[in-house]
Regions:
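Alpha4 helix (beta4-alpha4-beta5 surface) of REC/receiver domains from two-component response regulators
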Residues: 100-116
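Conserved PLP-enzyme active-site core in the AAT-like
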Residues: 49-51, 82, 90, 106-107, ...
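Conserved acidic segment of CheY-like receiver
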Residues: 9-40, 44-48, 55, 67, ...
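Conserved phosphotransfer microenvironments
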Residues: 30-34, 52-90, 97-105
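Terpene synthase/cyclase
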Residues: 125-192, 197
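Conserved N-terminal alpha-helix of the aminotransferase class I/II PLP-enzyme fold
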Residues: 184-238
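A short, well-structured beta->alpha microelement
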Residues: 6, 36-61, 74-75, 298-314
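Structural motif
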Residues: 23-30, 50-52, 66-72, 96-100, ...
Length: 404
C-alpha cells in the first residue's frame, strides 16, 4: 500500500475552495488593500469588515482572521480573539498594526492570543500575505480527521479506477439527460470520492491498516473507548457483531424488553442465549419507560434465573457472575435515558459484559447534561465492573449520511 501522509499530501488540498479569510480592518488604507489583494490573488475568498460585531460560532468556514489593533481597537481585538478561542476554534489570528507600534507594549500584550503580527511597512504586503496563507493551510491540514484527510489527499491526486462502483466517478450519469441532472445536482466530488473498498490506498477495515484503521483509533479517543470498530448497517449489525462475539448457546443474557429486534436476533436467535427478561414500565398513554427499578435487584434477578423454565440447572443462579451479557436500550424510543453508573452499581458485578444500545442517543458522550449517562465516559469504575460495549448509528443521532 502506498504510504499517504495526510498532513503532507502529494497534491495540495485546495483550501482556497474550502476556507476563507476575514479581515476586520480599515479597507481604505493602501497597504492593507495591497495585503488583501495578494491574498485574493491566491484565489482565497476575502471578507472585509470594519466591525468586530460578528457571531464567530456561526461561521466555521473561516481559515484566518486579520484584525486591526491600532488605537482604541486593541481591547475590541482582544475580546474578539477570546471569543474565537472560547468556542474551541483554533483559527489563525493575525494582528495588524502600524509599524511605529512595534514596540508598543499594549500591542505586545496580545502575545499568546494571536498567531502573528502584520506591521505594514516592516515587510512587504506580499510577504505577509504568504505568512497568512501558510497559517491557513497549516490550520486546514490540522482539521482533517484521518479518513477524510486521506480521502482528500487521494482525491487531489486525481486517481482513476476501473473497478466498481460502476458509475466510474459519475461519468456513467453524464451519458443521459436524466443522469446529467442527477450528476449536476450532487456535484462531481461526491462521485469521485465514492470508492471501492478494494482500493487499499485508503486502508482496509478487514485487516485494520491505513487511514481506515487510523480513523477507528481516532474515533475511540474521541468517544472515550478503548477500541472502536466501524460497522456497516448501523446499530442493528453492530448489535449482532457484539452478541455473536460474546455469547454462545446456553449462556444467560439479561435482556431489556425494550431492546431492538436486532438484539433479539443476535443474542437469542443466532447465538442461542437464554434470556432473563427485565420488565419495563408503560404509562396510560402507551409511552415506553424504563426498566422497573426493583427488577435490577440482585436477589430478584437470581430468583428469576431459578424459576426460568429454560434454565435446567438451578445452581446457575448461585454463580458469582451468572450473566454472560446484559443487553440494555440506553434510550427508549420515547426518550427515557438511564443513569448508566446507577444501573452498573446494581448489576455490574453480576455480568461479564454489558451492551448499551445507543442508537438513539449517540450524542451522550459530548454534553454535560448526560454526565453518568454515557458508558464510555464513566471513570473510577471498580474491579467488579464488567466490560462495556456501546453500539451506535452515526446516521441516526450523529451527522452521518442516511443508509439505504
Amino acid at each position: 500500500m502506498m504510504p499517504r501522509d495526510v498532513r503532507a499530501p502529494t497534491i495540495p488540498v485546495p483550501f482556497h475552495k474550502l476556507l476563507k479569510v476575514v479581515a476586520i480592518v480599515d479597507a481604505a488604507d493602501l497597504q492593507t488593500k495591497q495585503l488583501l489583494d495578494h491574498i485574493a490573488a491566491e484565489n482565497f475568498e476575502v471578507h472585509v469588515s470594519g466591525s468586530f460585531d460578528r457571531d464567530v460560532s456561526e461561521d466555521a468556514s473561516v481559515g484566518a482572521y486579520i484584525v486591526l489593533v491600532d488605537g482604541d481597537r486593541l481591547e475590541q481585538a482582544r475580546k474578539f480573539a477570546r471569543s474565537v478561542r472560547a468556542i474551541g476554534f483554533q483559527t489563525p489570528l493575525w494582528a495588524l498594526a502600524d509599524s511605529h507600534r512595534i514596540s508598543d507594549l499594549a500591542v505586545l500584550a496580545l502575545t499568546g492570543e494571536v498567531d502573528g503580527y502584520v506591521y505594514l511597512g516592516q515587510q512587504t504586503p506580499a510577504f505577509y500575505a504568504k505568512q497568512i496563507v501558510a497559517s491557513l493551510v497549516k490550520y486546514g491540514l490540522s482539521l482533517l480527521p484521518p479518513f477524510f484527510g486521506g480521502l482528500a489527499a487521494y482525491d487531489g491526486e486525481a486517481n482513476i479506477t476501473f473497478a466498481c462502483p460502476g458509475h466510474q466517478g459519475g461519468q456513467f450519469y453524464r451519458k443521459s439527460p436524466a443522469g446529467q441532472l442527477f450528476f449536476k445536482h450532487f456535484g462531481e466530488n461526491v462521485f469521485r470520492n465514492d470508492l471501492c473498498n478494494a482500493d487499499v490506498d485508503l486502508g482496509d477495515l478487514l485487516i485494520h491498516e491505513g487511514p481506515a484503521a487510523e480513523a477507528q483509533r481516532h474515533a475511540a479517543k474521541v468517544f472515550g473507548a478503548d477500541t472502536t470498530y466501524f460497522v456497516l448497517n448501523g446499530t442493528s449489525t453492530s448489535n449482532k457483531v457484539v452478541t455473536n462475539a460474546v455469547l454462545r448457546r446456553g449462556d444467560l443474557v439479561l435482556f431489556d424488553r425494550n431492546n431492538h429486534k436486532s438484539l433479539h436476533q443476535g443474542a437469542l436467535v443466532q447465538a442461542g442465549a437464554i434470556p432473563v427478561f427485565l420488565p419495563t414500565a408503560r404509562n396510560a398513554f402507551g409511552m415506553i419507560g424504563a426498566v422497573d427499578w426493583d427488577a435490577w435487584d440482585e436477589d430478584h434477578l437470581r430468583e428469576r434465573i431459578r424459576t426460568n423454565p429454560l434454565v435446567k440447572d438451578s445452581q446457575r443462579a448461585n454463580a458469582e457472575r451468572p450473566f454472560r451479557l446484559a443487553c440494555i436500550q440506553l434510550a427508549t424510543y420515547d426518550g427515557t435515558v438511564y443513569n448508566v453508573r446507577k444501573v452498573l452499581e446494581k448489576i455490574g458485578h453480576l455480568c461479564d459484559y454489558v451492551l448499551w444500545d445507543e442508537a438513539w442517543i449517540g450524542y451522550n458522550a459530548f454534553h454535560p447534561l448526560f454526565e453518568d449517562h454515557s458508558p464510555m465516559r464513566l471513570e473510577d469504575l471498580g474491579p467488579q465492573m464488567p466490560g462495556l460495549f456501546s453500539t451506535q448509528s452515526v446516521h441516526k443521532q450523529g451527522a452521518g449520511f442516511s443508509q439505504a
